[in-house]
């Protein structure tokens, strides 16, 4: 840390799941990681993940790809200007790049009215909306509750289908449905 002229370091002891100690030194020469680099990397292209998302690069500068399907919850938080929108766009772009419209639908809520507007161009393919809605991207906070209630109804109907089919996961159900068993 002294030879790098680092103002501060963080020690992670032990690194979870490993018998090692980590020393995190801030990088004062950060590199821009382009989305194209991530989406064309072998780690992303060749992945067998159900819902692959390209997050960024590891400390060893390797592309990092995670499976959104394996995450029970995902919270993105931070101060203004810290990259939350960039991260969200990376997740959305990853899924759009890897999935066909028949396999993926988004319900987008954008109370700021400007964060997700660029996705209005894919409305007919990737965005789900209520039958009586004019816009696929919800910007009116009053309509959010109604949309979430509709999603809960859809979720309950899907759970009923899983129960009838004797499946616990959507992947099991899809495999059963595709093979017509």
Question: PLM features: residue spans?
Answer:
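Cytosolic-facing regulatory segments adjacent to core modules
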Residues: 169-176
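Short, charged/polar, Gly/Pro-enriched secondary-structure boundary elements
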Residues: 28-34
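P-loop NTPase catalytic phosphate-binding loop
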Residues: 1-3, 10-24, 37-168, 181
